[in-house]
Curated annotation (Swiss-Prot):
Protein name, entry field: Flagellar calcium-binding protein
Source organism of the structure: Trypanosoma rangeli
SUPFAM superfamilies assigned to the protein according to its UniProt record, in alphabetical order: EF-hand (SSF47473)
UniProt binding sites for Ca(2+) 1: 52, 54, 56, 58, 63
Taxonomic superkingdom: Eukaryota
Residues annotated for Ca(2+) 2 binding in this entry: 133, 135, 137, 144
Domain annotation EF-hand: ranges: 39-74, 75-110, 120-155, 157-192
Gene name of the record: FCABP
Chain's role: May contribute to the rapid motility of the trypanosomes, playing a role either in flagellar structure or in calcium metabolism. Could alternate between a GDP-bound inactive form to a calcium/GTP-bound active form.
Family recorded in the similarity comment: Belongs to the calflagin family.
Pfam families documented for this protein: EF-hand_7, FCaBP_EF-hand
Any one GO cellular component localisation term in the record: motile cilium
Length: 204
């Protein structure tokens, strides 16, 4: 992506075009087994074993990061693979809170589905951002945001005053919204591109 040219063919700051990411996203959606089905559970068991290189029955962050690149190949979608740390931390913390057990430093199989759900959600935010960022400069301006209101509402947002909401996103008052600012806002509102009925609620 870039500031000039079509969004689909231009390059952006992280070296991935919107078209590249869309193709990669369709593949990633298929390889993250987050559904509550017997078939998905079997796939999770197999995936967990591939991540668990030390065969300890629990995953360190290094193992998760390595698995996301070597097994899931998430780096084909975006170099922002570091966001796996957010999914890892949320899953292990929530798993321990829900079950009153688990490790503070590892994700066990009990929390593995939670982690995959969070991972999916974080990467889905990149898809949303690409849809709105029509200039392709990896920043949202007020006009882009206002134009995207119908799409944002389809994803679950409730926006009565686009200008006020944009100011809320633009925390530093720069006049533009970064991916991180958008991600924080969208995550808090649980926006969803594909209407997934099985998202993990924050209060779960």
């Amino acid at each position: 992506m870039g500031a000039c040219g079509s969004k689909g063919s231009a390059g952006n700051k992280d070296g991935k075009s919107a078209t590249d990411r869309k193709v990669a996203w369709e593949r990633i959606r298929q390889v993250i087994p987050r559904e509550k089905t017997a078939e998905a559970n079997e796939r999770r068991i197999d995936l967990f074993k591939k991540f668990d290189k030390n065969d300890t029955g629990k995953l360190s962050y290094d193992e998760v990061y390595s698995g996301c690149i070597e097994v899931l190949k998430l780096d084909e979608f975006t170099p922002r693979v570091h966001i796996t740390k957010r999914a890892f931390n949320k899953a292990k913390d929530k798993g321990s809170k829900l079950e009153n057990k688990g490790s503070e430093d590892f994700v066990e199989f009990l929390e593995f589905r939670l982690m995959l759900c969070y991972l999916y959600d974080y990467f889905e935010l990149t898809v949303m951002f690409d849809e709105i960022d029509t200039s392709g400069n990896m920043l949202l301006d007020a006009k882009e945001f206002e134009k995207a209101v119908p799409k944002l509402e389809q994803w679950g947002a409730k926006i009565e005053d686009p200008a006020e909401v944009f100011k809320e996103l633009d925390r530093n008052g720069s006049g533009s919204v970064t991916f991180d600012e958008f991600a924080a806002w969208a995550s808090a509102r649980k926006l969803d591109v594909d209407g997934d009925p099985d998202n993990v609620p924050e209060s779960a």
